[in-house]
Amino acid sequence: MTSSIFRTIGIIGHSSYPKAINTYDVLYRWLYNKGIKVMIEQHASHLLRTHKAIIGNLHDIGDYADLAIVIGGDGNMLRAANVLSQYDIKIIGINLGNLGFLTDLNPHSALIELSKILSGHFINEKRFLLDIKIQHYNNVTILGTAINEVILYTNTIKNMIKFELYINNNFTFSSRSDGLIIATPTGSTAYALSAGGPILSPSVEGIVLVPICPHTVSSRPIIIDNKSTISLKFPKITPKLTIRCDNQNPIYIDKEKEIFIQRSNHILDLIHPNNYNYFKNLRIKLGWQKNSI
C-alpha cells in the first residue's frame, strides 16, 4: 500500500473504445490495491470485472474526488472537463484517441507516470474557459461554456452570416463569412488551426478570433486580451444561426438577441507528468521536423 496525496480518484471514459476495457480494469485494480478510494463514471462501470467499485456521474466525481483520470481521446476529455471545471478537482488523461493534445499519458507507461503523480511529482496548469451568453432586453442567460472554442455558423451552405463584432463595447469590424471561431489557447490547436488561426501557448492570456471563409481577404485572424468582452450583433435579415461549444449539442440563436463571449469564472485544472513540455508535444502531434542543425 503506497501513500498518495489524492484520497479519492475518479476514473472517467467512454465505452466506445474497445481497448479501454483492459486499461480500465488494470487502472482500477492498481489504485484499489494502493488503498485509494476509486469512483467510476457510470457510463464505464460495465467495463470493470468487479462489483466493488463506487459508481457515480461526473458531478459526483467532481464533488467527492480530488483527481480525475480520463481514459480516451481529447473529445472524451472535453466532455468530462466541461463538467469537472465547475469543481475543485485536478484532471489528467490517458490517451486512447488520435492526437491527444489534452491526454498526456501513454497507456503502456501510464502506471509508471501515475505512481510519480500520486507522490506529488507533477506539473500543474490552469486553463481558462469561455462563457457564451445572450441578452434579450435586460435578461442575460449563459448558454454554454467552452474549453476549446465557440463556433458560430449557419445550417445552410448557401447562406453567409453577416455580423458586427464589438470588443469591450467598441465596434471592431463587420464581416460576411461562413462563420466565426472564438478560441482559447487550448482550442488554438483544434478547429481554429484548421481555419488558418495561430497556435497560442497555454500561458498566453489571449483569445483567438478566426473568421471561417470570409468574403474579404482583409478579414484576418486576430488575438485579443482574454479579459475582453466580445459581443456580436446581427441584421434582422439573417439565416438561422447556430452555436456550438466544443462540438457539443447545437444551440440555436434568435438573430434579434445580442451574443456575448467572455472568460469564464471556471478553470480547467490540468496536471502533467514532470517531463511534460508543451512545444515537444506540439512537435510530436503535428509532425514537425526534428533538429537539422
UniProtKB/Swiss-Prot annotation:
Biological processes, Gene Ontology terms: NAD metabolic process; NADP biosynthetic process
Q: Which UniProt keywords apply?
A: ATP-binding, Cytoplasm, Kinase, NAD, NADP, Nucleotide-binding, Transferase
Q: Where, subcellularly, is it found?
A: Cytoplasm
Catalytic residues in the record: D74
Q: Which reaction does it catalyse?
A: NAD(+) + ATP = ADP + NADP(+) + H(+)
Q: What is its main location?
A: cytoplasm
Write down a Pfam family by its short name.
NAD_kinase_C
The Enzyme Commission number assigned here is: 2.7.1.23
- Gene Ontology CC terms, in alphabetical order: cytoplasm
Q: Write down the required cofactor(s).
A: a divalent metal cation
Q: What does this protein do?
A: Involved in the regulation of the intracellular balance of NAD and NADP, and is a key enzyme in the biosynthesis of NADP. Catalyzes specifically the phosphorylation on 2'-hydroxyl of the adenosine moiety of NAD to yield NADP.
Family of this protein:
Belongs to the NAD kinase family.
NCBIfam families the record matches:
PRK01231.1, PRK03378.1
Name the PANTHER family for this protein: NAD KINASE
Protein name (Swiss-Prot/TrEMBL): NAD kinase
- Organism whose genome encodes this protein: Blochmanniella floridana
Name of encoding gene: nadK
